[in-house]
Design a protein with these regions (language model features):
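Glycan-recognition and catalytic cores of secretory/periplasmic carbohydrate-active enzymes
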Residues: 1-141
Length: 141
C-alpha cells in the first residue's frame, strides 16, 4: 500500500477482503496447549500449507489498520512458528529441513511424509521472514 499503486477506494476494498480472509484461517488454528498439534490448523498438518497460511497472515498484518486484528495475527503467527520449529528435522544431513507432514516421525505414516521439498521450505521460510519483520517493527525481536 505504501507505493500508492492503487486508489484509496481500491485499498479499502483490498484491506476489507484481507481482513475477511483472516477470520476463517484464525478460527481453524489449534490453540489448546495440550494438543500435540498446538499452533497448527485443524485437519491440516502439512508444513507447506502452514507456511502458506503464515505468509498470508503476515501479509494481512501489513495491510490492516486494526490493532486488535494485528494482536490476534501476531499471537497466531507466534504459535504457528512454535509448531513449525517443533516439526523441523533436528539432526543429520537434513537438519533444518521441513518435511511434507508434521507426522513424519510417527510410525505407520505414508513414506512421503518425511520427504523434504523445496516448496515446503520456501513457504515456511517466507512466512518466518515476514514474521521476523513484524517482530522487528514491533520491537519484539
Amino acid at each position: 500500500f505504501k507505493a500508492n499503486l492503487v486508489t484509496p477506494s481500491e485499498k479499502n476494498t483490498m484491506r476489507a477482503y484481507a481482513e475477511q480472509m483472516a477470520i476463517p484461517m484464525l478460527s481453524n488454528q489449534i490453540t489448546n496447549k495440550n494438543n500435540s498439534y498446538f499452533g497448527a490448523f485443524k485437519d491440516n498438518v502439512r508444513l507447506c500449507s502452514l507456511g502458506t497460511i503464515m505468509e498470508g497472515m503476515a501479509s494481512i498484518y501489513f495491510c490492516t489498520d486494526s490493532e486488535d486484528l494485528k494482536k490476534i495475527l501476531f499471537k497466531s503467527m507466534s504459535i504457528g512458528n512454535y509448531f513449525l520449529s517443533k516439526t523441523q528435522v533436528k539432526t543429520g544431513i537434513f537438519a533444518g529441513g521441513l518435511p511434507n507432514s508434521a507426522n513424519w516421525v510417527k510410525p505407520g505414516v505414508t513414506p512421503n511424509a518425511s520427504v523434504i521439498r523445496i516448496d515446503n521450505v520456501q513457504h515456511v521460510a517466507s512466512g518466518w521472514l515476514k514474521f521476523q519483520k513484524i517482530l522487528d517493527i514491533t520491537g519484539l525481536y
